[in-house]
Structures are given as C-alpha cells and as structure tokens.
C-alpha cells in the first residue's frame, strides 16, 4: 500500500489480491484534512493486454486491437467493462471484468480518449479534468477507464472507495448481460471488504517487536548480595 497527501486530502491506496479467485481489489481510503468540503471522484486506468508476454512485446498495437470492450450496466455498481481477447491464446479467450466497488458513472476503452494524438507523451491525461466520454473506441491503445460516482467529502470526514478486477483464463462466448452474475462472485470474496490498516505508534517509532511489546521484567533498586547470587546461579562460577 501507499499513502500520501494531495491538496488537503490524505489518501491510502492498497492493492489486495484474492486468495480463492483470480481477482484483485484497489481499496482507497480518503480523509479530508482541509477546512472546507471537497468534491471528489476516483478514476481507474488500466492498460490491458490479455495475451502472453512474448506476443505483447512482439507487437503491442496488434494485440491491443483484438481486445473487445463491452460496457455492462449493473443495478448496484453502475457501469462495468468486460474485456475479451478475441485473438485466441492457446485456443482460449482471456477475459477481464472491471468495475467499481461503489457505483461507476463514466468509462472509456482507448488511451486516445484521454491522451489525444497532439498530447502523446505528456505525463497527465488531458481528459482527467472532465467526465469520461462513456463511448467505445477500439483502436490500438486498449485501456480500461472507469469513473466512480462523484461525492462530497466534508472537512474532517473519512471514506473508503475502490475498484475490482476479475480475470478468467477462457471466456468462450462474447461478453453480454449474462456476465453480470460474476459481480456476485466478486463481492462475495472476503477481500472485497475494506479492512482498517494496522495501527502505527503515534510517536513514529519503529514497528512493534518482542522487546517493545513484551511485559517488562520486574526490577528492584537494591543490588543482590552474594547469598542471593549463589541461589540464582548454583553452578560453578567462572569469574
């Protein structure tokens, strides 16, 4: 996980891998440390290949062009994007479902929708200051982009949001409404629930260890005399 501060907001981002499925979760915690309310939305951007490493390195544009992106509308989680590699991989069609843990309201499927040709090579996507276009492009810059529902975070308030990904090695049929049932499997995973981070000492000291957390030995002020020392260490003395 990583954490930091930006414009009065403290954020903590954690990537959690599911133990019982090929799935992952981006958990985001936000705290408004400013003195005024903030309007916030979260974006997920993921460059996709859904192909073997060798094929991707040989021709990224060719592999990207064969990914079919299909937006799906879920009653509780808004817009999802199902991405299927239509160029067979060892006779299989790898498939990824991406969605919001909250409610998705915007989406895009190609990097050119966020980085137009005239902005190629720039660090920041020119479209990040506006809503995602919610239109399907299937060119040679395959990208999943999801925008969560905008909300107001009051001063001193804290919230948790996030996104999920579910990967299948083979999805023989084209993406469609029947795939919405996968969301129930995703949300049933224990990793879908945000868990508080481990506590850290307020003084910024080192993480807890045996010497810092074990009960202290009882001590006394007076020095032990020879009789007590022989009682504690009855064997032969070397010094």
What is the predicted role of each segment?
Residues 9-12, 87-92, 153-155:
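Short, surface-exposed beta-strand/loop "edge" segments at domain boundaries and coil↔beta transitions
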Residues 1-23, 121-147:
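Extended, loop-rich substrate-binding clefts of extracytoplasmic carbohydrate-active enzymes
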Residues 38, 151-169:
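Short Pro-Gly-centered flexible turn/kink motifs
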Residues 10, 23-25, 158-162:
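Intrinsic-disorder/low-complexity, polar/charged segments enriched in Ser/Thr/Lys/Arg/Asp/Glu/Gln
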Residues 7-9, 36, 157:
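Short acidic/polar mixed-charge low-complexity motifs
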Residues 2, 16-126, 173, 177-238:
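Polysaccharide-binding surfaces and accessory modules of carbohydrate-active proteins
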């Amino acid at each position: 996980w990583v954490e930091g501060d930006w414009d009065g907001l403290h954020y903590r981002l954690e990537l959690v891998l599911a133990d019982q499925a090929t799935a992952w979760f981006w958990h985001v915690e936000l705290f408004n440390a400013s003195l005024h309310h903030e309007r916030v939305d979260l974006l997920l951007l993921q460059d996709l290949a859904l192909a073997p490493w060798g094929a991707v390195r040989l021709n990224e544009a060719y592999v990207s062009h064969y990914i079919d992106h299909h937006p799906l509308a879920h009653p509780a989680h808004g817009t999802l994007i199902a991405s299927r590699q239509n160029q067979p991989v060892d006779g299989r069609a790898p498939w990824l479902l991406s969605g919001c843990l909250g409610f998705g309201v915007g989406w895009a499927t190609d990097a050119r929708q966020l980085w137009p040709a005239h902005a190629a090579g720039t660090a920041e996507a020119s479209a990040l200051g506006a809503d995602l276009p919610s239109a399907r492009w299937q060119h040679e810059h395959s990208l999943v982009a999801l925008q969560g529902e905008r909300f107001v975070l009051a001063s001193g308030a804290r919230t948790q949001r996030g996104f999920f990904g579910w990967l299948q090695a083979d999805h023989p049929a084209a993406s469609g409404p029947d795939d919405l049932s996968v969301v129930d499997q995703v949300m049933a995973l224990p990793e879908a629930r945000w868990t508080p981070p481990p506590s850290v000492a307020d003084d910024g000291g080192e993480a807890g260890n045996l010497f810092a957390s074990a009960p202290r030995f009882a001590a006394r002020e007076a020095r032990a005399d020879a009789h007590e020392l022989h009682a504690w260490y009855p064997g032969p003395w070397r010094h």
